[in-house]
Amino acid sequence: MQTPLATPVPVLRLPRGPDGSNRGFAPDGRRAPPKPEVPEPPESRESWEQQARASLRERYLRSLLAMVGRPVCFTLHEGVQVIAHFGATDLDVANFYVSQLQTPIGIQAEALLRCSDIISYTFKP
């Protein structure tokens, strides 16, 4: 038994665009809705601070991503410096998972560094 043929679907043909490749329409064409001239409200101090915090957080998260698999020098309290290969961080960025941690008293194969103990870190991208 044969299967019935599918019902043909009508095709809607759009008018040609402003360039020869039929891509898009001219923004000043008769079909474009007029855009109202609305002045932007002045940014408040709070929105400026929020943008600054968002920018700093994005830079911090990008630096964490760039550190993965690289040797990183961590400066801890009391001026202690340790070097380790950065692996990952937990979801709330409270701990760093590192490997080959070189401390003043020896090398640890794997370790967790609490972010509250870290003063700064440096690495070469």
Curated annotation (Swiss-Prot):
Keywords for this protein: Acetylation, Cytoplasm, mRNA processing, mRNA splicing, Nucleus, Phosphoprotein
GO CC field: cytosol; Gemini of Cajal bodies; Sm-like protein family complex; SMN complex; SMN-Sm protein complex
Keyword Acetylation: yes
Span list, region Disordered: 1-52
Molecular function per GO: RNA binding
Segments crossing the lipid bilayer: none
Origin superkingdom: Eukaryota
Residue intervals of the Sm domain: 59-125
Residue numbers carrying Phosphothreonine: T3
Modified-residue entries (N-acetylmethionine), positions: M1
Places the protein is found: Nucleus, Nucleoplasm; Nucleus, Gem; Cytoplasm
Domain SUZ-C: 1-29
GO biological process: spliceosomal snRNP assembly
The family this protein is said to belong to: Belongs to the gemin-7 family.
Reported function: The SMN complex catalyzes the assembly of small nuclear ribonucleoproteins (snRNPs), the building blocks of the spliceosome, and thereby plays an important role in the splicing of cellular pre-mRNAs. Most spliceosomal snRNPs contain a common set of Sm proteins SNRPB, SNRPD1, SNRPD2, SNRPD3, SNRPE, SNRPF and SNRPG that assemble in a heptameric protein ring on the Sm site of the small nuclear RNA to form the core snRNP (Sm core).
Subunit description: Part of the core SMN complex that contains SMN1, GEMIN2/SIP1, DDX20/GEMIN3, GEMIN4, GEMIN5, GEMIN6, GEMIN7, GEMIN8 and STRAP/UNRIP. Part of the SMN-Sm complex that contains SMN1, GEMIN2/SIP1, DDX20/GEMIN3, GEMIN4, GEMIN5, GEMIN6, GEMIN7, GEMIN8, STRAP/UNRIP and the Sm proteins SNRPB, SNRPD1, SNRPD2, SNRPD3, SNRPE, SNRPF and SNRPG. Interacts with GEMIN6; the interaction is direct. Interacts with STRAP/UNRIP; the interaction is direct. Interacts with GEMIN8; the interaction is direct. Interacts with SNRPB, SNRPD2, SNRPD3 and SNRPE; the interaction is direct.
Protein name (database record): Gem-associated protein 7
The organism's taxonomic lineage, starting at the top: Eukaryota, Metazoa, Chordata, Craniata, Vertebrata
Gene that encodes the chain: GEMIN7
